[in-house]
Design a protein with these regions (language model features):
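Catalytic cores of carbohydrate-active enzymes across secretory and cytosolic contexts
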Residues: 1-276
Length: 277
């Protein structure tokens, strides 16, 4: 029976007894996917270790098995803090002036993706469907293909995909574009993001449009579509209804009178527009 194999930078492992995972967008999306499939969730443990092993630690929680690996201090510095968050994150959010490219950071980013691929390949079964998440892992499919895996591999990009002139300001842009077409299906948040990536592949990688979001690049076919992530409407509705029973909530609402109160919960990051709000 086919399993769903999720790969992300971090893994949200529920506590024994089924306590819910974190409420971030990626964690919620993955949790919903596992309601329909048995599967495996692979990624970084969140631990920095001086001598990390490539053999993942396996943790079983009902229908889902979690597989995590540690990162070395150098890997964390170059792959995560470096290329992913000092180069890709600002570029993807159109903040070129805040981006910083380092060859050593990019080497670390590539190295960790290669390490992840080697560790994951040992766990993947022939019928598994692999679904990779977010900008930390753009080259992962290419690394897996290089190890001989021909499983269906999809990718979902949780943040914006910028216009070609912005993305191509990154010195490694060509390598990343060539790597991303090793995914069979690429999911983005908006139609504008889809157009940005498709045009870039056509203009710089000689991709041939086939219709329906499909492209042929160097003999390989990939499909790019918009799949915007929503929220758990039923869950939010239930939480709001339960909140009315809370005395503090009732007093707050009464104190507002005719005014409206909007509450946002965000990291203190320039991409969140906190000062503007």
């Amino acid at each position: 029976m086919a399993r769903l194999v999720i790969v992300s930078n971090r893994v949200a492992i529920p506590e024994e007894g089924g306590k819910a995972v974190a409420a971030g967008g990626l964690a919620v999306a993955v949790k919903e996917a596992f309601t329909a499939y048995e599967g495996l969730w692979f990624g970084w443990s969140g631990t920095i270790s001086e001598e990390p092993s490539e053999e993942p630690t396996l943790i079983d929680r009902g229908r889902v098995q979690y597989a995590v690996v540690d990162l070395s201090p150098q890997d964390h510095l170059e792959y995560y803090a470096g290329f992913a968050n000092r180069a890709l994150w600002p570029i993807m959010h159109y903040r070129l002036g805040l981006g910083a490219f380092s060859r050593s950071d990019y080497a670390g980013y590539s190295r960790v993706n290669r390490t992840f691929a080697r560790a994951l390949a040992k766990l993947v079964e022939p019928d598994d469907i692999i679904w990779v998440h977010d900008y930390h892992l753009l080259p992962l499919a290419a690394e897996l293909r290089g190890l001989g895996l021909d499983n269906p591999i999809g990718y979902f990009h949780h943040i914006p995909w910028p216009a070609a002139d912005v993305f191509n300001s990154l010195p490694a842009s060509g390598e990343l574009l060539r790597a991303i077409v090793d995914y069979d299906l690429i999911g983005l948040q908006t139609e504008a993001d889809v157009q940005n990536l498709q045009r870039n592949l056509v203009d710089t990688q000689r991709a041939i449009p086939l219709g329906g979001g499909s492209l042929m690049v160097d003999g390989r076919r990939t499909r790019i579509r918009a799949f915007p992530i929503g929220i758990d409407v039923a869950g939010f509705k239930e939480a709001a209804e339960k909140a009315n029973a809370n005395k503090v909530v009732r007093e707050t609402i009464a104190g507002l009178r005719t005014r409206k109160l909007l509450i946002g919960v965000d990291r203190l990051d320039y991409s969140k527009g906190v000062p503007e709000r």
